[in-house]
């Protein structure tokens, strides 16, 4: 069974195509004319004028090293960022969820590597920019919270997925037609004309076919064991510790537990709470949501 799972992950890895470009001027020109929407010590994400998302990463030290690939596939951790981010996005695509950005391909141009993600459209902007353009209503804020929590809960149940860095710039907001959306066991809920899309998986980890996929160089001392490394409550607390998400909402007492934790930048687990999409529904605020005609 282990060998079968290994083959499944290896097949995923082969789908991570690296396209080499000899002329780098055009790639850099696109990025220069785009907008930097997020950055860190390992790279930066740009939104191009036509809506495409591109992440420019620092040169991975061993992108083509067979030993590194083997360790990654065996569940011993990946050393390079691009390989893992491509794998994470490829795995999450199996959820067929509109709330996770899709992976396209990796470009290599000289010493630099670029992850091309799907075209979300020029009107899709980071949450931090979105809240500067308008005052969110209770119902809009609640719709954003529910979509985030539902998507994370689904990904964690299926793949033990943890994003690891859910700050406002890693959450894109797209204006869409207002309609009722189907959310599994929760039924149909009004989306308030907003779609949430999660991006940037530089700190992410998950399990695919039982094999843990994670990076070895991202402060391994944060986690004492796999239970902590794949504790999904870290993401939930990261969201509910952000006043921009929960302003004026009294959704669950669990939120206050998160807010009083004094979380670090990457929300290191474990946390003694388990906030789910059901907790949000119990607020009864969704009972008041109707589509105005």
Regions found by a protein language model. Give the residues of each.
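Activation segment
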Residues: 59-60, 122, 174, 178, ...
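Conserved kinase catalytic-core helix
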Residues: 133-164, 168-169
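Intrinsically disordered, low-complexity regulatory segments that flank or precede the catalytic domain
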Residues: 1-18
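C-lobe/activation-segment region of protein kinase-like
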Residues: 187-279
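Catalytic-loop of the protein kinase fold
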Residues: 156-174, 179-188
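Conserved structural core of kinase catalytic domains
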Residues: 78, 99-139
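ATP-binding glycine-rich phosphate-binding loop
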Residues: 18-51
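ATP-binding glycine-rich loop module of kinase domains
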Residues: 42-94
């Amino acid at each position: 069974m282990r060998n079968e799972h290994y083959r499944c992950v290896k097949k995923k890895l082969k789908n991570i195509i690296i396209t080499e470009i000899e002329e780098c001027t055009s790639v850099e020109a696109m990025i220069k004319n785009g907008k930097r929407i997020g950055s860190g010590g390992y790279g930066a994400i740009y939104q191009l004028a036509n809506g495409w998302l591109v992440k420019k990463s620092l040169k991975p030290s061993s992108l083509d090293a067979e030993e590194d690939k083997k360790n990654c596939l065996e569940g011993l951790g990946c050393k390079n960022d691009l390989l893992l981010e491509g794998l994470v996005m490829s795995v999450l695509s199996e959820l067929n969820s509109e709330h996770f950005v899709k992976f396209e391909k990796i470009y290599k141009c000289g010493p630099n590597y670029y992850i091309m993600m799907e075209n979300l459209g020029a009107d899709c902007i980071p949450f931090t920019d979105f809240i500067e353009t308008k005052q969110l209503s209770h119902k809009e804020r609640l719709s954003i919270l529910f979509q985030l929590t539902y998507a994370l809960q689904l990904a964690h149940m299926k793949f033990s997925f943890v994003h690891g860095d859910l700050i406002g710039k890693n959450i894109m907001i797209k204006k869409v037609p207002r309609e009722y959306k189907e959310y599994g066991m929760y039924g149909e809920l009004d989306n308030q004309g907003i779609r949430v899309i999660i991006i940037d998986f530089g700190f992410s980890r998950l399990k695919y076919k039982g094999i843990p996929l994670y990076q070895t160089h991202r402060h391994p001392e944060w986690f004492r064991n796999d239970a902590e490394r794949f504790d999904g409550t870290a993401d939930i607390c990261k969201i509910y510790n952000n006043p921009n998400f929960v302003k004026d909402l009294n959704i669950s007492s669990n939120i206050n537990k998160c807010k009083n934790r004094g979380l670090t930048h990457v929300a290191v687990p474990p946390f003694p709470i388990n906030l789910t999409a059901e907790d949000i529904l119990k607020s009864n605020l969704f009972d008041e949501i109707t589509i105005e005609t």
